[in-house]
Amino acid sequence: MELHILEHRVRVLSLARPGLWLYTHPLIKLLFLPRRSRCKFFSLTETPEDYTLMVDEEGFKELPPSEFLQVAEATWLVLNVSSPSGAAVQAAGVTKIARSVIAPLAEHHVSVLMLSTYQTDFILVREQDLSVVIHTLAREFDIYREVGGEPVPVARDDSSNGFPRAQHGPSPTVHPIQSPQNRFCVLTLDPETLPAIATTLIDVLFYSHSPPREAASGGPGSSSIAFFAFSLIEGYISIVMDAETQKKFPSDLLLTSSSGELWRMVRIGGQPLGFDECGIVAQIAGPLAAADISAYYISTFNFDHALVPEDGIGSVIEVLQRRQDGLGS
């Protein structure tokens, strides 16, 4: 398999809900006029707490500082795994890279963020951790770094000088999980037809807000939550929304898989997770991979979110609760 280090240098930001009005103009520019901003990596995720933005340096320039905008200190690099065209199709999403990427990075104390889209899965690592990432994954992958749009092979360094060996160390923190009742769709859209849904998208993102709801907090079967994710990355659009919100959009423009599968969410974290802890994604992706369950995974500024097939949510909760009980004992 190949691991590509993409050219994007990404910043991760939290926009407080009361400050949304201040950023509507730059967000509309990033959403609908990417040629004007030259932004190639843009992701906006609405959660009950805030809006998480993942943007490259060009996109970051569009967002003026304010009391409403919180910026994570690190600059993040974007990794992407490509499988050979003839590879057997197994569970999709983060599950297929759980053993080969997520687990080894957790063992080497590398914190990761995940952004699954309709098209692929992006793994974000801090720029300062890149040498450890390359050293950790070089045995498993042919690694390429994009330079000027072209993949350049990264020399494999067989020496282990200066690199810590994988450690099991203290047990990871056991983070609570909840499963809101929403049923979600993972969709894409031909960028040429984006103007046709622009007014609906603006309405949903900026004007369709009920009063802020508490995050799902009633145990594994919590009520519905606000969640909407839009990404425009290298010209490809991906949208995650609940089935009720989808009804507002023209059905002939939004594309989904032929099965039209619906997904349920597992939300990870009782308190904001921060960016320093390692192994959070592995804590979820590992058990799902062992059970061969497909999952999309979206990290946000405060919490993580896994989307699993609707008909398997019961077994997913059981698998994860069993894992948590094992870690907590």
Curated annotation (Swiss-Prot):
Task: State a single Pfam family of this protein.
Answer: ACT_7
In the UniProt record, does the keyword Amino-acid biosynthesis occur?
A: no
InterPro entries (alphabetical): ACT-like_dom_sf, CASTOR1_ACT-like, CASTOR1_N, CASTOR_ACT_dom, CASTOR_fam, CASTOR_mTORC1
Q: Which UniProt keywords apply?
A: Cytoplasm, Phosphoprotein, Ubl conjugation
Q: What are the recorded Gene Ontology BP terms?
A: cellular response to L-arginine; negative regulation of TORC1 signaling
**What are its GO cellular component terms?**
cytosol
PTM info: Phosphorylation at Ser-14 by AKT1, promoting the interaction between CASTOR1 and RNF167. Ubiquitinated by RNF167 via 'Lys-29'-polyubiquitination, leading to its degradation, releasing the GATOR2 complex. Ubiquitination by RNF167 is promoted by phosphorylation at Ser-14 by AKT1.
Annotated binding of L-arginine, by residue: S111, V112, G274, I280, V281, T300, F301, N302, F303, D304
Cellular localization per UniProt: Cytoplasm, Cytosol
Q: Which family does it belong to?
A: Belongs to the GATS family.
- Job description of the protein: Functions as an intracellular arginine sensor within the amino acid-sensing branch of the TORC1 signaling pathway. As a homodimer or a heterodimer with CASTOR2, binds and inhibits the GATOR subcomplex GATOR2 and thereby mTORC1. Binding of arginine to CASTOR1 allosterically disrupts the interaction of CASTOR1-containing dimers with GATOR2 which can in turn activate mTORC1 and the TORC1 signaling pathway.
What subunit structure does UniProt give? Forms homodimers and heterodimers with CASTOR2. Interacts with the GATOR2 complex which is composed of MIOS, SEC13, SEH1L, WDR24 and WDR59; the interaction is negatively regulated by arginine. Interacts with TM4SF5; the interaction is positively regulated by leucine and is negatively regulated by arginine.
- Quote the record's domain comment: Based on x-ray crystallography data, the protein would be constituted of 4 tandem ACT domains instead of the 2 predicted from the sequence.
State the name under which the record lists this protein: Cytosolic arginine sensor for mTORC1 subunit 1
Q: What is the species of this protein?
A: Bos taurus
The organism that produces this protein has a lineage beginning with:
Eukaryota, Metazoa, Chordata, Craniata, Vertebrata
